[in-house]
A protein has these predicted regions:
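SAM-dependent transferase fold signal centered on methyltransferase-like domains
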Residues: 1-443
Length: 443
């Protein structure tokens, strides 16, 4: 094994196709495994840095490294599991009070990143994986990482094997991350098409354990998934980081009776040292929440007196500043469009334009944690004249088009601007004012 890991370190920057073609040069090395390790390490760099930095780890399947959790999402997941398992759902329990004293069974172990992170929070973890190569690699890697509280199981997760897998392991919570690839490696999104099929397993699992935590694709339809899973759905955590929605976490509680809660979570840079932003709501709240639109009588900084003025003079003379809020990926995936407006006192540009206006600087600062906030410099009807003027004043700017008769690339070309600087020009549709050109600066 040491020869293999040394070889991997020496050839991290090599052309992998060339390594495969030249395999006869290294008769003592399993080149296929070495290439898989190199591919995996490249994917893990910056994603799970502690694993990348440990030269002793081996990875027999490159796809597993691509699909595994990042350190940030794994930490969030483990913290959530700890709160669920050790406090029967008391989400306000202090983290220092819930470390240890509970057990988790991971029935779809994969590369093992989630099991490894769970082991840092739980007293014991059961890792089960159907692929023998992955299972053997995980056992080796856990030892190399010093994770000595993980049991290893190599079985297919199916209705007739659940009891055998769990054996005498008294799990407080069962975790599953169903594989989202069907025959021929094709991606699937319906929960019943994933492997294992949670719909056929959940009732059997509930005979042994009260809580189930599922990780699903961010592409999954939340309403459809919860309808299929039934009344035991208690919470749906929509987890985003780095400007991307990464995963859906479904907490199922055997004893739960009631409406499920949706929790939109934005993990900031520096997490877990920096607290994540959360926005929780129930679907029924969103349905009855009134829509507050940006109306005809609402005024933003205007370009009406553009002639004979410079950008500096317009900025100095404008009235109370307005802010444009662009919800983050977690909020958008969660489907929170009207309630965010109600809770923060925002005005939505249009029913289908999910951008919001506020004059309140304090609210704007808070909203930065849940998305992006821009200070509005100028705003006017979107037409040839306004685009020409904006392009002249801001030759370097970021550009976004939403719900107007052109996409972002076309809008950028018509403006004649190149990417860069701190200005951001939006082309957005307002129900009250039609298509608008809004010039902003990121806060």
């Amino acid at each position: 094994m040491e020869k293999l890991t040394d070889f991997v370190q020496e050839h991290m920057g090599d052309d992998l196709t060339r390594l495969v073609l030249d395999r006869k040069k290294w008769p003592d090395i399993d080149i296929d495994l070495a290439v898989s390790c190199i591919q995996s390490r490249r994917k893990l760099k910056g994603k799970v840095q502690e694993w990348f930095s440990n030269p002793s780890l081996i990875f027999p399947a490159g796809l597993s490294a691509e699909q595994c959790s990042s350190t940030a999402t794994a930490v969030y997941k483990a913290g959530l599991a700890a709160r669920i398992a050790s406090s029967d759902g008391d989400m306000d329990a202090a983290l220092e009070k819930i470390r240890g004293g509970w057990r988790l069974a991971d029935l779809t172990g994969g590369l093992g990143v989630d099991s490894w992170m769970f082991s840092k929070f739980a007293s014991e973890v059961l890792y089960n994986e159907m692929q023998e190569k992955l299972c053997m690699a995980a056992e080796h890697n856990f030892k190399a990482l010093g994770a000595d509280n993980i049991r290893i199981s190599n079985q297919i997760t199916a209705p007739d094997t659940i009891m055998e897998i769990l054996g005498d392991f008294g799990a407080n919570i069962i975790y599953m991350d169903p594989a989202r690839r069907g025959e021929g490696g094709k991606k699937v999104f319906l929960i019943e098409e994933c492997t294992p099929d949670v719909l056929t397993l959940k009732d059997i699992i509930f005979e042994r354990c009260r809580h189930i935590l599922l990780k699903l694709s961010p592409m999954a339809d939340i309403t459809m998934v919860c309808d299929r899973l039934g009344s035991s759905c208690r919470q749906v955590h929509v987890v985003a980081t780095g400007g991307e929605c990464k995963e859906l976490l479904i907490w199922m509680d055997r004893e739960w009776e009631g409406e499920y809660e949706v929790v939109a979570v934005e993990l900031p840079a520096g997490y877990p040292d920096v607290e994540p932003a959360r926005f929780s709501f129930k679907v029924s709240e969103e349905k009855i929440s009134p829509l507050t639109l940006f109306g005809r009588n609402d005024i933003m900084p205007s370009l009406a007196s553009r002639e004979n003025t410079t950008l500096a003079s317009r900025e100095e003379s404008r009235d109370l500043p307005h802010y444009l809020f662009e919800p983050g990926k977690a909020l958008m995936k969660a489907g929170c469009y009207n309630l965010i407006s109600e809770r923060f006192g925002l005005h939505k540009l249009g029913r289908s334009t999910h951008y919001y206006i506020t004059e309140d600087a304090t609210k704007a600062e808070t909203l930065k944690q849940l998305g992006k906030v821009y200070e509005i410099i100028d705003c006017q009807p979107l037409d040839k004249r306004s685009m020409k003027a904006a392009g002249k004043d801001y030759p370097r700017a970021e550009v976004t088009a939403r719900n107007i008769p052109m996409d972002t690339d076309t809008f950028r070309k018509k403006l004649g601007v190149s990417s860069g600087d701190d200005a951001h020009i939006f082309g957005l549709k307002s129900d009250a004012h039609g298509n608008l050109l809004i010039i902003t600066r990121r806060r």
